[in-house]
């Protein structure tokens, strides 16, 4: 549940009961219990008897590694009346996503290291998940002059995109 995410799980024990676990790493696909202590999964078994501070009945739910969404629109900076880093990240977390990649079509366009830094700093301060920011390929997403891609990558941007727009002149 969301309230557990908001509290954080670093110092508590959580027992997730009766969930359908799908884990490609261990090839598990079935009904299991999961015991988490101090932010670490310590046991996955068909029936765990240990006590925990928080018990979550996951009957009818899937329990799996966090999902990654490589195309989200957080609209921050500049259009926070539509979405913010915080609200977009919260919505993603509710849906089981632990990492999102925000597209650069913001106002101003995230076409430089300062705007990349702005989003990453805001995400670190208030997002319950990993928020990554794609940099624009061209300045202002106008398709003509290349943005300073090296500086955006150095600032932590893992991808570049025009988010559906064409690059008209790559020279």
Residue ranges, per PLM feature:
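Metal-associated gating/positioning segment near the N- to mid-region
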Residues: 58-123
